[in-house]
A protein has these predicted regions:
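A generic structural signal for residues embedded in beta-strands
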Residues: 78-79, 185
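SH3-family beta-barrel domains
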Residues: 144-162, 175-179, 187-189, 211-222
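N-terminal capping segments
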Residues: 1-49, 72, 80-105, 118-120, ...
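Short alpha-helix capping/helix-loop boundary micro-motifs
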Residues: 58-67, 167-172
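Loop/turn positions that initiate beta-strands
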Residues: 73-75, 180
């Protein structure tokens, strides 16, 4: 399974999850945080090789676990607590582990810039658009790190993005590529630059101007997740308003 297939399966699994239950993987409509990933892999025919748990995953199933590093599409991200921190609850099986952090929550990076992280929490499936407490990131060994993918050129300002001869601002501009253009990412040079192909020409473009292109089906899945999240927020606001109204009526 490559990166884009993994993302597609994560979104597909997220859309069938209706609620949170510990130890579930989405196949029956319920999931916990790691179950979102386990169920996604199952949809792609990849079996889970160990314990259903975020601490197990962070210790045995990922490469390059790092803190506050640049995110990549397809990364797993973790929230963690240190010994003595409120809520710290590292399972006893890891008492002898060199790493004593409690990795208590996990999500998947759908997009690195701007950030979009999908995860399953007590309130259901959520899409985070800020990094927040997602301090740790790593690559799941079960996924082939896909360097080549289709992307759309994007920027908040201006009408074009520069395609350069090399990976740096000092290199000559080969083309000014219009925002919204489709390009093929051939490889990521470093945290800032990627090699891309545009209309038969190869060059380098800053990664922050490249948004991976999801299939129409994947975009629909993502929209379903967002709409459900918005609906949940509205329902919670209505319940809070009803409670406040009841309290006011009691005081009359």
């Amino acid at each position: 399974m490559d990166t884009m297939q993994f993302i597609a399966c994560v979104l597909q699994n997220a859309c069938r999850i209706r609620g949170y239950k510990l130890g579930h993987d989405g196949s029956d409509g319920y999931s916990d945080c790691i179950g979102l990933i386990i169920g996604a892999l199952a949809l792609g025919g990849v079996p889970w090789p160990g314990i259903n748990g975020t601490n197990y995953t962070a210790r045995y199933l990922v490469d390059g676990l790092r803190q506050n590093a640049d995110l990549k599409m397809g990364d797993l991200v973790f929230k963690a607590r240190s010994p003595g921190e409120k809520g710290y609850d590292l399972p006893p099986r890891y008492a002898d582990s060199a790493d004593q952090l409690d990795y208590y929550h996990v999500g998947v990076v759908l997009q690195a810039d701007p950030v979009r992280i999908v995860h399953c929490t007590a309130g259901g499936v959520r899409l985070d658009e800020k990094r927040g407490d997602w301090q740790y990131s790593a690559w799941l060994r079960l996924i082939k790190n896909q360097q080549t993918y289709a992307a759309t050129v994007t920027a908040e300002n201006g009408s074009t993005v520069n395609l350069r001869q090399g990976p740096g601002l000092q290199y000559e501009i080969l083309r000014q590529v219009p925002i919204g253009s489709a390009v093929e990412v051939l490889g990521e040079t470093d945290a800032d630059w990627a090699c891309v192909a545009y209309q038969g020409m190869e060059g380098y473009m800053m990664r922050r101007f490249l948004a991976p292109r999801l299939s129409q089906e994947d975009e629909r899945y993502e929209q379903i997740i967002l709409l459900r999240q918005q609906l949940d927020a509205i329902q919670q606001a209505v319940l809070a308003a009803q409670k406040a109204l009841e309290e006011l009526v009691k005081t009359e």
